[in-house]
Regions:
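Serine-esterase "nucleophile elbow" of acetyl-processing enzymes
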Residues: 3-53, 63-72
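Structural recognition of the beta-strand scaffold that forms the well-ordered cores
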Residues: 12-13, 47-49, 75-79, 113-116, ...
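Solvent-exposed loop/turn segments at secondary-structure junctions
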Residues: 18-20, 52-57, 82-87, 118-122, ...
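Catalytic-core regions of hydrolytic enzymes
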Residues: 51-73, 85-102
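Short, amphipathic alpha-helical "lid/cap" segments that border enzyme active or binding sites
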Residues: 61, 95, 170-181
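Active-site segments of SGNH/GDSL-like serine hydrolases
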Residues: 79, 99-133, 152
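Extracellular serine-dependent O-acyl
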Residues: 113-118, 129-159, 174-188
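Conserved small/polar residues in nucleotide/adenosyl-binding loops
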Residues: 189-196
């Protein structure tokens, strides 16, 4: 799919409290940290916080059309499913909702980086197996740039999480930003290649 852009200029973080900056001042929200880090690396990219604390994949789907309505959006980081998992929502339902969000973004010619989640064994081994498989299956089916686990290097590390043990603190947010930035750089290069080939 051709993307008519010379570079990524606007990124939307489309997720839940794990990307929304829950419990942190605005300057330490993931959107702020990621935008600053990208600028320091030479990328003039605006990062929009389109995440909503408490959002399930169903809630994300309900707001996807208007949240992604800005024609200037080049890329979304899709990171939802944690609240589905906490509520025991069936993985098939989560997968269906995420796939619909992916399709909405594709129709709008928005690039997608899919950030995966990993379930604990709270709801049983079968639930964990089915849930964990959602993200690699969707990334393969739709040929998406893929971050296997959004909280890689952060989850279960007390020094990188707030007192609730769930939401990243300032240092944890920096780590997540680094993980996402690597994938954005790949997507940036991909868009540049598309533009060069087109012209």
């Amino acid at each position: 799919m051709h993307i008519n852009a010379s570079a990524i200029e606007k990124v939307v973080l489309f997720g839940d409290s794990l990307m929304a900056g829950y419990g942190l001042p605005k300057e330490h929200h993931l959107s702020s940290v990621l935008e600053n880090n990208l600028k320091q690396a030479g990328f003039n990219i605006q990062v929009i916080n389109g995440s909503v604390s408490g959002s399930t994949s169903s809630g994300g789907l309900n707001r996807a059309e208007w949240s992604l309505s800005d024609p200037g959006i080049d890329l979304i980081i899709l990171g939802m499913g944690a609240n589905d998992m906490l509520r025991g929502i069936q993985p098939d339902e989560t997968k269906k909702n995420l796939e619909q969000i992916i399709k909405i973004a594709k129709v709008k010619k928005i690039q997608i980086i899919l950030a995966g989640m990993i379930a604990p064994t709270t709801h049983g081994a079968k639930y964990k197996k089915d849930f964990d498989a959602i993200y690699p299956k969707l990334s393969k089916k739709h040929n998406l740039q893929f971050i296997p686990f959004l909280l890689e290097g952060v989850a279960l590390n007390p020094s990188l999480n707030q007192q609730d043990g769930i939401h990243p603190n300032q240092q944890g947010t920096i780590k997540i930003s680094e993980n996402i930035q690597k994938s954005i750089t790949v997507s940036y290069t991909h868009l540049r290649a598309h533009e060069t080939a087109y012209y």
